[in-house]
């Protein structure tokens, strides 16, 4: 199978930098595109990104730049930006001549906004001719950057594209599987952060490990409910058992290294929850995704009690846990 001659990663945070480090294991021409000139120079000269990854050393041949004019020359472009920045990022790349010659791998988790939609649906409008795939897995950024064992699922409507990307990213310490179910992988990636908030709340309330295991089962059911409503899981439910779904879900819910679990835990132990929510400034993807998922629950009249329970803890005046009708998983 052919290798990509070069790979770009757009997004210089912890996850983007770690993905660039991963890609550089198999490709000698990898460039990280970011906005911060100082961090770009640090990566070029010191091979570190202290702000996001501490003193972890990055591959010697990894390049970094703020010059987007050259990104169109890269065969594979990995998008690793926060969900709130997704639309603007794609629009910006479009102004720099991204085309059908560039394959996109979306590593961003969440939903597109205004209106709420899957990233794949938004890309049909913004970049309809670019080959696209989606990336998800139990991948803590610092562990990836340290080359510790990990795995990921890669989904694309074009299974040949998924296989090519998997071939280019796979290594002895990094395994991949492929799927054509892009909907379920995206839904799981967005919802996992909300379930992690619930896991943190339960941890703060000392609900025990039994409750956390039960949460995982309930979470998988609700992922299936929303996925089916959005057109996923048309052939089978095997995707739920892949690392990009249950693997990512378990890691996010069980690790206090997860911002979302940490947020849920701190919310759970807070004596003044209203004040805590008003003053909490750190980005929590699950908190942002929650508002968008509620729109989808209402639109499709779904029964997702765990999501609704988290909403009742985080957002005032939301639908109660019993709202909606039962949408059974097939």
UniProtKB/Swiss-Prot annotation:
Pathway: Membrane lipid metabolism; glycerophospholipid metabolism. Sn-glycerol 3-phosphate binds at residues 109, 137, 192, 248, 258-260. One of its GO terms (cellular component) is cytosol. SUPFAM superfamilies: 6-phosphogluconate dehydrogenase C-terminal domain-like (SSF48179), NAD(P)-binding Rossmann-fold domains (SSF51735). The active site is at 192 (proton acceptor). GO terms for biological process: carbohydrate metabolic process; glycerol-3-phosphate biosynthetic process; glycerol-3-phosphate catabolic process; glycerophospholipid metabolic process; phospholipid biosynthetic process. Keywords: Cytoplasm, Lipid biosynthesis, Lipid metabolism, NAD, NADP, Nucleotide-binding, Oxidoreductase, Phospholipid biosynthesis, Phospholipid metabolism. NADPH binds at residues 14-15, 35, 109, 141, 259, 283, 285. Its EC number is 1.1.1.94. Pfam families: NAD_Gly3P_dh_C (PF07479), NAD_Gly3P_dh_N (PF01210). It is found in: Cytoplasm. GO terms for molecular function: glycerol-3-phosphate dehydrogenase [NAD(P)+] activity; NAD binding. Catalyzes the reduction of the glycolytic intermediate dihydroxyacetone phosphate (DHAP) to sn-glycerol 3-phosphate (G3P), the key precursor for phospholipid synthesis. Belongs to the NAD-dependent glycerol-3-phosphate dehydrogenase family. This is Glycerol-3-phosphate dehydrogenase [NAD(P)+].
